[in-house]
């Protein structure tokens, strides 16, 4: 990476102001050569009616971290990233604490990117497994 880890985290979290990420309190919390990680608090604002994490909030977390991961590796002056397909398998319920999303590349193409995103709880138990496809398009 050409810029520091701290600069990437600051840029990502600053860019999420006034977005769904801010509404859901999603924070980009770690980055490495081949991954990006975010966390989201699990509380009443992301519950489904029976008091556990809503699958839609989980998918929003997954798409957020995957899209940011793609964004880090492009020239943002010339291109933008959009999610074009996402799938999720929810494996475990969570009712409190934080969930963590770790996005890693499966495919890193010029136009499309494919991510494996694992959502875990605070004890590192697997909560959901997601796949996200993003597309990089010119700003023209």
Residue ranges and their predicted role:
Residues 1-140:
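Terminal targeting signals and extreme-terminal segments of soluble enzymes
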């Amino acid at each position: 990476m050409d810029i520091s880890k701290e600069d990437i985290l600051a840029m990502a979290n600053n860019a999420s102001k006034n977005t769904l990420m801010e509404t859901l309190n999603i924070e980009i919390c770690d980055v490495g050569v081949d991954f990006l990680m975010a966390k989201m608090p699990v509380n009443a604002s992301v519950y489904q009616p029976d008091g556990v994490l809503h699958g839609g909030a989980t998918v929003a977390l997954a798409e957020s971290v995957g899209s940011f991961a793609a964004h880090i590796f492009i020239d943002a002056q010339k291109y933008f990233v959009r999610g074009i397909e996402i799938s999720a398998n929810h494996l475990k319920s969570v009712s409190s604490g934080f969930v963590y999303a770790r996005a890693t590349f499966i495919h890193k193409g010029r136009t499309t990117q494919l991510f494996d995103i694992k959502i875990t709880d605070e004890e590192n138990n697997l909560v959901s497994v997601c796949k996200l496809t993003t597309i990089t398009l010119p700003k023209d």
